[in-house]
């Protein structure tokens, strides 16, 4: 599965996708309702 790179802008289609590292934007690691 694709992951979010550090510093990548978090947009709606990235919500809930895994991060490439622990330093990514928090919102990308959280599934919104």
Curated annotation (Swiss-Prot):
GO cellular component: extracellular region; host cell presynaptic membrane
Signal peptide residue numbers: none
SS bonds (residue pairs): 3-20, 10-24, 19-28
Modified sites of kind Proline amide: 33
Record's subcellular location: Secreted
Tissue spec: Expressed by the venom duct.
UniProt GO MF annotations: calcium channel regulator activity; toxin activity
Main location: secreted
Keyword Cell cycle: no
Keywords for this protein: Amidation, Calcium channel impairing toxin, Disulfide bond, Ion channel impairing toxin, Knottin, Neurotoxin, Presynaptic neurotoxin, Secreted, Toxin, Voltage-gated calcium channel impairing toxin
Entry remark concerning the domains of this protein: The presence of a 'disulfide through disulfide knot' structurally defines this protein as a knottin.
UniProt function note: Omega-conotoxins act at presynaptic membranes, they bind and block voltage-gated calcium channels (Cav). Has strong insecticidal properties at a dose of only 100 pmol/g of body weight (when injected into the haemocoel of the wax moth G.mellonella larvae). Provoques tremor and uncontrolled movements in insect larvae, that are typical symptoms caused by neurotoxins. On fish G.niger, intraperitoneal injection of the toxin causes full extension of the fins, change in posture, breathing difficulties (at 30 and 100 pmol/g body weight) and death (at 100 pmol/g body weight).
Protein name: Omega-conotoxin-like Vn2
Native species: Conus ventricosus
């Amino acid at each position: 599965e694709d992951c979010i790179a550090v510093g990548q802008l978090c947009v709606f289609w990235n919500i809930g996708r895994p991060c490439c590292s622990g330093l990514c934007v928090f919102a990308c690691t959280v599934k919104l309702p």
